[in-house]
């Protein structure tokens, strides 16, 4: 990949469902092993500097994108047998224990493969951490473990693992380890995707180098000191886009901004619009404190003050990023832009 080679001096591109990948020079390799183990092996090789691929006197940045756990979770092609054996005899109701789960869904049969994939990823990622320690790099390396989305896994009676404001889909891990600099704790910071890059730069001591046009914020001071004087966000945006216009060949050319919402410390709100009229067609409103499993969708008209406050915060955030809902003034009767 010419683009990948331009962005990164050492690159491995891999398709986890197919047993092949391409290296920096575009050469194809067929590892014939489960992708997370292959990827952790490539990271370990890079850290050990096999083949003299990096300058050991300079800092390094590694991004590892492991595909599992990822649907369909149907067979041992999606996980390692040793991991599946840990779960194969477990009753489904001992694995899927959330009260909003529907065990009658066909997807429930995937649970054992799903948890096997999670276990395998844990082991593969652990191998990287072990290597950092063996090489004496663990004390001066910022390690971040995150995900792009969650997995509903039969919660809310939906087959879709993502693309929703439900907690199982929207809440993801963001674990940061920096020995001696960050004290272990759990923080309720509402970190959003645009904040990740500037925060990572801040963690690396490069806060002064963050470009002015970056929309996200650097929350590194909060990681170093939970009492740091910095304004915490009161909410995080939920954005759902679907396919828009297509050309004569059926290829998607634009997207349709189907839903916008906001998640705060207490509430989750999502508004969905009709494709033709762009008027409200569905809403989701949950009190995540009183109803943590989001079992009761609250009517908007019976919670006007709460909805007005949430829409006000959401409108300001959409305006800040020049979102299509703001530029087209979608649902302006509810959202004060």
Residue ranges of model-derived segments:
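Non-transmembrane alpha-helical segments in soluble domains
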Residues: 44-48, 115, 122-129, 133, ...
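Outer-membrane beta-barrel proteins
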Residues: 30-36
């Amino acid at each position: 990949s010419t683009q990948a080679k331009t962005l990164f001096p050492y690159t491995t591109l891999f398709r986890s469902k197919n047993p092949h990948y391409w290296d920096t020079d575009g050469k194809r390799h067929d590892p014939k092993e489960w992708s997370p183990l292959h990827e952790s092996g490539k990271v370990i090789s890079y850290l050990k500097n096999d083949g003299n691929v990096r300058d050991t006197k300079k800092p390094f940045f590694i991004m590892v994108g492991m595909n599992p756990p990822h649907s369909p979770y149907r067979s041992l092609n999606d996980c390692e047998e040793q991991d599946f054996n840990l779960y194969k005899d477990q009753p489904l109701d001992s694995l899927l224990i959330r009260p909003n789960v529907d065990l009658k869904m066909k997807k429930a049969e995937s649970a054992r493969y799903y948890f096997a994939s999670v276990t395998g990823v844990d082991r593969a990622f652990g191998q990287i951490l072990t290597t950092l320690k063996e090489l004496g790099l663990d004390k001066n390396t910022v390690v971040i473990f995150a995900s792009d989305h969650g997995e509903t896994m039969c919660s809310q009676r939906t087959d879709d693992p993502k693309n929703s404001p439900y907690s199982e889909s929207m809440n993801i891990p963001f674990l940061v380890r920096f020995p001696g600099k960050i004290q272990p704790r759990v923080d309720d910071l509402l970190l959003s995707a645009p904040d990740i890059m500037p925060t990572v730069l801040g963690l690396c001591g490069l806060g002064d180098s963050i470009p002015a046009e970056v929309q996200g914020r650097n929350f590194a001071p909060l990681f170093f000191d939970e009492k740091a004087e910095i304004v915490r966000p009161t909410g995080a945006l939920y954005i759902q886009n679907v396919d828009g216009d297509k050309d004569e060949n059926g290829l998607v050319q634009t997207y349709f901004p189907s839903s916008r919402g906001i998640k705060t410390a207490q509430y989750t709100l999502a508004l969905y619009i009709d494709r033709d009229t762009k008027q409200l067609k569905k809403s989701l409103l949950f009190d995540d404190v009183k109803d943590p499993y989001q079992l009761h969708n609250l009517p908007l008209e019976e919670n006007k003050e709460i909805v007005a406050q949430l829409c006000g915060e959401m409108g300001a955030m959409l305006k800040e990023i020049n979102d299509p809902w703001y530029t087209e003034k979608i649902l302006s009767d509810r959202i004060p832009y």
